[in-house]
């Protein structure tokens, strides 16, 4: 039985990685992806049920974990299959559009596309900010099936309208109570909303959501052509694709020093710490080793790590999947270490990284 389960698991994981690498925009392929994920969970569940702790050198998760992952896969698969029967089935649907992370991003239980960042300054303080995502296209399940609408922003929050009903998926007042100071009596909060080239200000004793009908609104329609984009951030640590992440808290810095700068997947230089390159391509300090962080969905990274076993001569060590404990994102990370930067460059030139995986470079102490 172990051999049969191992062969089935290997075939499913190979197919999943093929779908990641193909980066298809066909809804049928996204449905197939989630079918494979569901079947993978079923194989792992069966393996654990009969007492196997490892399969294909992979740790078999507990029954509870496999069951929970299968339920999530079924949820997304059924939603996509119902979308396949709608008028929106011929639109472009990427793996990211159909990902579990996107499904659980606010507004939850909806499909979203074409997001832009919205920055809110609580107390109108640039050091006390929160970032949100305003979606250009939102697909909402209603009484008559899927309905496509668009996101809107006003001083009160982010919302969409379906069947004449305005639905807020972010209310700034709720976060103002958490992060703002107000007047100390539970009101008197103020904030600024920055979206595209528009700035909206709110300052009042906020006590009722009825205020929102009186506030100006910014609409995001058809690829955001109604808003002039903001200039790119000067801070090199800022992410370009802010819209693809859930809202993230930006806290005040306790020190005046610059943070360690993250590198994007296109960067080929090390900007982290005090390590410098010498003529041999090695780190100037023997205590530092070049690394690559691979960030993406846990299942994709596990399949990729399995494939990287064929390229062991191109790296020194590779970690298991891990996550930041205090990070809101569900994305997992795999870290790869190298003997020197020349080996890392050979790795980058040889290994094909799926487009759904984010690659960043840096160094770490050893």
From Swiss-Prot:
Residues 289-366 are annotated as: DNA-binding domain. InterPro entries: E2/EBNA1_C_sf, Nucleotide-bd_a/b_plait_sf, Papillomavirus_E2_C, PPV_E2_N, Reg_prot_E2, Regulatory_protein_E2_N, Regulatory_protein_E2_N_1, Regulatory_protein_E2_N_2. Phosphorylated. It holds the Pfam family PPV_E2_N. The keyword Transcription applies. SUPFAM superfamilies: E2 regulatory, transactivation domain, Viral DNA-binding domain. It is found in: Host nucleus. There is a cross-link at residue 295 (Glycyl lysine isopeptide (Lys-Gly) (interchain with G-Cter in SUMO)). Residues 224-261 are annotated as: Disordered. Keywords: Activator, DNA replication, DNA-binding, Early protein, Host nucleus, Isopeptide bond, Phosphoprotein, Repressor, Transcription, Transcription regulation, Ubl conjugation. Disulfide bonds: none annotated. One of its GO terms (molecular function) is DNA-binding transcription factor activity. GO terms for cellular component: host cell nucleus. It comes from the Viruses. Residues 1-207 are annotated as: Transactivation domain. GO terms for biological process: DNA replication; DNA-templated transcription; regulation of DNA replication; viral DNA genome replication. Belongs to the papillomaviridae E2 protein family. Binds DNA as homodimer. Interacts with protein E1; this interaction greatly increases E1 DNA-binding activity. Interacts with protein L1; this interaction enhances E2-dependent replication and transcription activation. Interacts with protein L2; this interaction inhibits E2 transcriptional activity but not DNA replication function E2. Interacts with protein E7; this interaction inhibits E7 oncogenic activity. Interacts with host TAF1; this interaction modulates E2-dependent transcriptional regulation. Interacts with host BRD4; this interaction mediates E2 transcriptional activation function. Plays a role in the initiation of viral DNA replication. A dimer of E2 interacts with a dimer of E1 in order to improve specificity of E1 DNA binding activity. Once the complex recognizes and binds DNA at specific sites, the E2 dimer is removed from DNA. E2 also regulates viral transcription through binding to the E2RE response element (5'-ACCNNNNNNGGT-3') present in multiple copies in the regulatory regions of the viral genome. Activates or represses transcription depending on E2RE's position with regards to proximal promoter elements including the TATA-box. This is Regulatory protein E2. The gene is E2.
């Amino acid at each position: 039985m172990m051999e049969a389960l191992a062969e089935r698991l290997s075939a499913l994981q190979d197919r999943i990685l093929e779908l990641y690498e193909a980066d298809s925009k066909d809804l049928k392929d996204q449905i197939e992806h989630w079918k494979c994920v569901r079947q993978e969970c079923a194989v792992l569940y069966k393996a654990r049920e009969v007492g196997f702790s490892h399969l294909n050198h992979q740790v078999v998760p507990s029954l509870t974990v496999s069951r929970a992952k299968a339920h999530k896969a079924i949820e997304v698969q059924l939603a996509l299959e119902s979308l396949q029967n709608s008028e929106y089935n011929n639109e472009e649907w990427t793996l990211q559009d159909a990902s579990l992370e996107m499904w659980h991003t606010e507004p939850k239980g909806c499909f979203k596309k074409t997001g832009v960042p919205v920055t809110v300054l609580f107390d109108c303080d640039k050091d006390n900010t929160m970032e949100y995502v305003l979606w250009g296209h939102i697909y909402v399940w209603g009484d008559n099936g899927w309905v496509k609408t668009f996101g809107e922003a006003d001083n009160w929050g982010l919302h969409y309208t379906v069947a004449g009903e305005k639905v807020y998926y972010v209310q700034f007042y709720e976060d103002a109570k958490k992060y703002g100071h107000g007047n100390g009596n539970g009101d008197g909060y103020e904030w600024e909303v920055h979206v595209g080239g528009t700035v909206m200000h709110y300052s009042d004793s906020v006590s009722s959501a009825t205020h929102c009908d009186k506030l100006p609104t910014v609409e995001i329609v058809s690829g955001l052509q109604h808003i002039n984009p903001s200039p790119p951030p000067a801070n090199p640590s800022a992410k370009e694709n802010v819209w693809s992440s859930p809202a993230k808290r930006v806290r005040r810095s306790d020190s005046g020093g610059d943070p360690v700068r993250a590198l994007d997947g296109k960067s080929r230089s090390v900007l982290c710490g005090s390590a410098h390159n010498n003529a041999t391509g090695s780190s100037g300090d023997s205590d530092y080793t070049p690394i690559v962080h691979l960030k993406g969905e846990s299942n994709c990274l596990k399949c990729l790590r399995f494939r990287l076993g064929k390229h062991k001569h191109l790296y020194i060590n590779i970690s298991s999947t891990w996550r930041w404990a205090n990070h809101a994102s569900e994305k997992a990370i795999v870290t790869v270490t190298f003997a020197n930067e020349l080996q890392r460059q050979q790795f980058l030139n040889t290994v094909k990284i799926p487009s759904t995986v984010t690659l960043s470079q840096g160094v770490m102490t050893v």
